[in-house]
A protein has these predicted regions:
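Residues in and immediately flanking transmembrane alpha helices
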Residues: 67, 86, 110-113, 144
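N-terminal subdomain of lithium-sensitive/metallo-dependent phosphomonoesterases centered on the IMPase/IPPase/PAP
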Residues: 1-99
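Residues that scaffold the ATP/ADP-binding catalytic core of kinase and kinase-like folds
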Residues: 31, 104, 149
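Acidic beta-strand-loop-alpha-helix segment within the catalytic core
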Residues: 116-172
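Flexible, active-site-adjacent loop/turn segments at secondary-structure boundaries
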Residues: 39, 48, 103-104, 110, ...
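Glycine-rich active-site/cofactor-binding loop and its immediate structural neighborhood
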Residues: 90-134
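Short, function-defining helix-loop hinge/capping sites that tune catalysis or transport
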Residues: 62, 85, 105-108, 112, ...
């Protein structure tokens, strides 16, 4: 994917990526609205929960990102070993947490997101943080700024987010 593509926040690339996150978010909300939330499948190796919502979002995002940019591999928190074999050699890839805040999801706090980042040379160069219940996305790219888009409040482009430049000595 040419850098110029994601560095223009009006590019159709962003429309596709935001729609993909919204689709994954809708799937998560279907599970969230189940009466029992009995969708917990098991605990992962780190003892964090894994739900049907995690897996549904993972599937939607993995397939969608592969269609959006076929040459880029996807590293997802829910990927199995075969999907991420050779990841140390990847210089450009998608990094995904299909449901960040699974415990909060299970507790119904509403405090969970979908996180998608484009990594290039070990650096995040573009990304989306999507809040499924709010139907709101924060997205941006290195050198292009950031925007917020709400499907509830907007009918057009995302609203620019004012940011301050980082100094060379800033630690994050």
């Amino acid at each position: 994917m040419p850098a110029a593509r994601y560095q223009h926040l009006d590019d159709p690339f962003w429309t596709s990526l935001l729609a993909l996150c919204a689709e994954a978010g809708s799937s998560i909300c279907e599970h969230y609205n189940e009466p029992s939330l009995a969708g917990k499948l098991r605990a992962k190796a780190d003892d964090s929960p894994l739900t049907r919502a995690d897996l549904a979002s993972h599937t939607i995002l993995s397939r969608g990102l592969a269609a959006l940019e076929p040459a880029l591999p996807v590293l997802s928190e829910e990927s199995d070993r075969s999907e991420i074999a050779g990841r140390r050699r990847w210089s450009r890839f998608w990094m995904v947490d299909p449901l960040d805040g699974t415990r909060e999801f299970l507790e119904r706090t509403g405090e969970f997101t979908i996180n998608v980042a484009l990594i290039d040379a070990q650096r995040a160069v573009a990304g989306v943080i999507y809040q499924p219940l709010e139907r709101r996305a924060y997205y941006g790219a290195l050198g292009a700024g950031a925007r917020c888009y709400s499907w509830r409040e907007s009918g057009g482009e995302g609203e620019a987010i004012r940011t301050s430049p980082l100094s060379a000595s800033t630690l994050i």
